[in-house]
Each structure stands twice: as C-alpha cells, then as structure tokens.
C-alpha cells in the first residue's frame, strides 16, 4: 500500500506532492570510465551535462567498505555535482567531505553506498535535489557527519534505506534529515536514525510502500552493531 508520511517530528502535508521522477534513469549523452576518482574543489560546480561516469568493469565489490578514493566523484566542502548518471561499475558513488549539493544525480545500480557525507558540522546542510537511485541492497545515503541532510524530490527503487545516520561511527553525534516530495518503491525503511544520539527525521509528502518508513536505532561507537529499537511516529 502506498502512503504519504509525516514522521518525527510530525508534519501534516496540506496537499500530496510526491515528485520523484518515475521515468527511469535518463539516457546518457556520453560515457566516461575513469581509473581514478574525480575531485571537485571546495565551492566549485561540476555539471556533467547528463554524461554517465563510472570506474570501469569490475569496480563493484559488493558490500565491501570503500573510501573516497574508490568513489566516482569526491566533493570537497561546498561543492556541487549536477546532471550526471553514475553507472553500475563503481564501488562508491559520491563522497562529500563536508556539506555538498547534488542536483539531478542518478545512480543506475548502487554498489556499496550511493552517497556518503562526512565531516559536516552541526548547522551545516547538504542538499540532494532530484535524481534517484536503483538497486541499493543497503543504504543509498550514508551520513557520517553531524549536520543536516535534505533530500528533495528524490526517487528510490529496490533499496534497503534511503538515508541512514551512521550506526557505528567511531565518533557519534546528533544528525538531522529532512525528506520531502520523495518516492520510494520496493524497499525497506525510508529513513533510519539513532534515537539515543537525539537524531531527528522529518518526512513530508513522501510516497512509500514501506510498512515502517522511519525506524529508530540504538547507535553505538566503533566495532559494534546498532540495534533497531522502534519506529518514528507518523
């Protein structure tokens, strides 16, 4: 069953507006396979013009944890990536070192994580606007920093979680996530946050077929496994 959710803290939408594009991954204008990560300098904009980028055949190693050097794009603080398709041949999609902006970034087949955000501080915001991701067996967005992640008009299909607050980072903190106008099909929970660290999640005008779109975890620090402890209200 499809539902529109307003979850912790509760926000009741005036009108439904699930605006994630459901027409599939855009047709690429070109295809580039690179042997090394592409870095986007702090504050700069990389407009791919709807080209597809990947790291070449065999790059994906399943759920083996990688780092920024394994990514297709590495965005420094304040950088923007837009109008791009991340191909299936990659271990990590996009890494952000600090807050970043992604506009119309599509992932045709997620390997480990599509988007990893780290080193953002409380009060800093990352924006993921439009775009979407397919076939993420675990997370689409992994948030390791301490700021706010805003996900607007995104599309997710066949996924484990859309955003997830880091469950076992060495240094833990409060994190915030805001999801609006997003469509999520054939997946698990839309949002996973750590109740014990004071995380907040707001879901507004989200269309999902998940039984429990927002899930609380008891996070931990280091070599440990977070535990699911309940469901966000809404």
Curated annotation (Swiss-Prot):
Cofactor binding: number and manner: Binds 1 Ca(2+) ion per subunit.
Keywords: Calcium, Carbohydrate metabolism, Cell wall biogenesis/degradation, Lyase, Polysaccharide degradation, Secreted, Signal
Main location: secreted
Assigned EC number: 4.2.2.2
Cysteine disulfide links: none
One protein family per Pfam: Pectate_lyase
Gene Ontology MF term list: pectate lyase activity
Role, per record: Pectinolytic enzyme consist of four classes of enzymes: pectin lyase, polygalacturonase, pectin methylesterase and rhamnogalacturonase. Among pectinolytic enzymes, pectin lyase is the most important in depolymerization of pectin, since it cleaves internal glycosidic bonds of highly methylated pectins. Favors pectate, the anion, over pectin, the methyl ester.
Name this polypeptide is given: Probable pectate lyase F
Native organism: Aspergillus fumigatus (strain ATCC MYA-4609 / CBS 101355 / FGSC A1100 / Af293)
């Amino acid at each position: 069953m499809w539902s529109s959710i307003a979850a912790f803290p509760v926000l009741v939408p005036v009108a439904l507006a699930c605006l994630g594009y459901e027409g599939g991954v855009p047709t690429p204008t070109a295809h580039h396979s690179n042997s090394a990560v592409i870095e986007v300098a702090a504050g700069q904009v990389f407009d791919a013009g709807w080209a597809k980028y990947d790291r070449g055949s065999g790059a994906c190693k399943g759920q083996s944890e990688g780092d920024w050097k394994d990514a297709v794009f590495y965005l420094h603080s304040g950088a923007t990536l837009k109008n791009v398709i991340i191909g299936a041949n990659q271990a990590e999609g996009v890494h952000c070192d600090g807050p970043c902006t992604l506009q119309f970034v599509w992932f045709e087949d997620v390997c480990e994580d599509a988007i990893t955000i780290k080193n953002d501080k409380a009060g800093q915001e990352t924006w993921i606007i439009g775009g979407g991701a397919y076939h993420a067996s675990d997370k689409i967005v992994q948030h390791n920093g301490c700021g706010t992640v805003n996900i607007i008009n995104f599309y997710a299909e066949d996924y484990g979680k859309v955003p997830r607050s880091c469950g076992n980072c060495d240094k833990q903190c409060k994190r915030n996530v805001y999801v609006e106008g997003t469509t999520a099909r054939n997946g698990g929970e839309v949002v996973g946050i750590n109740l014990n660290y004071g995380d907040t999640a707001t879901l507004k005008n989200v269309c999902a077929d998940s039984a429990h779109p927002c899930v609380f975890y008891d996070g931990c620090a280091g070599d440990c496994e977070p535990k699911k402890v309940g469901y966000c209200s809404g």
